[in-house]
């Protein structure tokens, strides 16, 4: 750790350390808000690289991607420009869990993002390893020092170090210092953070082998085609690129696969005891799956292309830390892969992280003013989680550098806010992945209305320009007008059209109904209205969907909003000091144990305890109300 005065080679408003998905969003946000920004990366040729699965979106992750775009970020636009395949997951379920997922072209994605950051005003990109922080007399950030001794000044620094901080990759019992295969680990910064009193820990993740597509027999696999109708992450049509899509394929593990793994578990880094870092619960290695789900005869393995012009296939669901000599045998035990050629081995990577309870919800650290952290250093896993934190850290680093109030994203207004609230308030000791179940407000926090929730804020912050703002206003006006039309126009029982709709749907029309009434019926959608000539062809698909969802789910949405309002109203309600939570049978067992251990003072504090979900809070409020009424009744009797 260095102290001022220091001879700075150059001075900036904000320095971002790292150029992955978090670093790029942070640097772009800072620069676009008028701050002279430096983005420091270990490798200028690997900006926005996708070292694991080259994909964007999926359950909860797509909501984050839409939200970053709604604020003015890039990840959604990147996916829309470079996708190989797109599919909507959970399409048969409700809109709260609809999830767009795009397989992306790995090299194209990185090249397009590199071009964007290289041509961004106010943004300087430089290759180098930051190893130390420069602090002022009051322990405030003043800059950074690189491995070779060069110092750069800054009012704010954002750490987005990914898996590089103290990174070690493992294949079997062999290891080497690296942030990912073929790239240096970052050294020095962990020691600086420890010296400043920060707690750091170790986490692990992994990536599967890559296989030559020319050596795979797809006829033995199940094709996974793209959706015919392409959907988009970005709310900006200028980012939409119609392109030919590529299929993915599905194969499965076999008894031979399972036996190979069971016989050699002792050779894996975790089961062999070479490392003891926690890996991601929701993205386990294949050996973890075999151990944890021993009763399963087979596991799905998805075969996904990494690009249009490269032969590499990503073997999703098959990450491992087992020795390289075993990996080819394991791969060749999969149907369609009997003669496959392995181009890159799978490996596990262990790295340092900074538990995010040491951060404010602005992502500025509590110990050092002007120091922010975002992405995997905060204990998360996934490009989307990283990008979401990156744009928040970039916004707030810029605000801090400019002496303005920083922005806090409430959990009830976005998945992004839920993510950061969880990170900053819960003691998480394993890589955190965003899930729809983590949000108690998921019916309100949908992908389709991310712009409605966050674009006005993006405009206020300064990341949404006039063109995007005009697009947003037009869309919202069109949805509002269409909802009014649907609530006004009616179909009569005795009209030929009314009789046809009744016959087709098997549901009678009594006297007359509005078009909104029709939309509220199960399995009746806007496309059905359109088929009867009752739709509005001038609207975009997104505008039609927005109007339909608001009408069809209005009762559920209102109920959830009431729950939000109720919990908000009761946030400061004090909890009885002597309350024995273990006796409150309407609480889940996990909630009883956590509440009894933590002993929160208020309802608001209780909502932020890991393992206590919204249903538990509602049950607790009901319990307190019942106790209050019983107490009043007893007092009335005795008086």
From Swiss-Prot:
Pfam families: GIDA, GIDA_C_1st, SAM_GIDA_C. It is found in: Cytoplasm. GO terms for biological process: tRNA methylation; tRNA wobble uridine modification. NAD(+) binds at residues 279-293. Its cofactor is FAD. The keyword Transmembrane does not apply. InterPro entries: FAD/NAD-bd_sf (IPR036188), GIDA_C_N (IPR049312), MnmG (IPR004416), MnmG-rel (IPR002218), MnmG-rel_CS (IPR020595), MnmG_C (IPR026904), MnmG_C_subdom (IPR047001), MnmG_C_subdom_sf (IPR044920). One of its GO terms (cellular component) is cytoplasm. Keywords: Cytoplasm, FAD, Flavoprotein, NAD, tRNA processing. FAD binds at residues 18-23. One of its GO terms (molecular function) is flavin adenine dinucleotide binding. Gene3D superfamilies: FAD/NAD(P)-binding domain (3.50.50.60), GidA associated domain, C-terminal subdomain (1.10.150.570), tRNA uridine 5-carboxymethylaminomethyl modification enzyme MnmG/GidA (1.10.10.1800). NAD-binding protein involved in the addition of a carboxymethylaminomethyl (cmnm) group at the wobble position (U34) of certain tRNAs, forming tRNA-cmnm(5)s(2)U34. Belongs to the MnmG family. Homodimer. Heterotetramer of two MnmE and two MnmG subunits. PANTHER family: GLUCOSE INHIBITED DIVISION PROTEIN A, PROTEIN MTO1 HOMOLOG, MITOCHONDRIAL. This is tRNA uridine 5-carboxymethylaminomethyl modification enzyme MnmG.
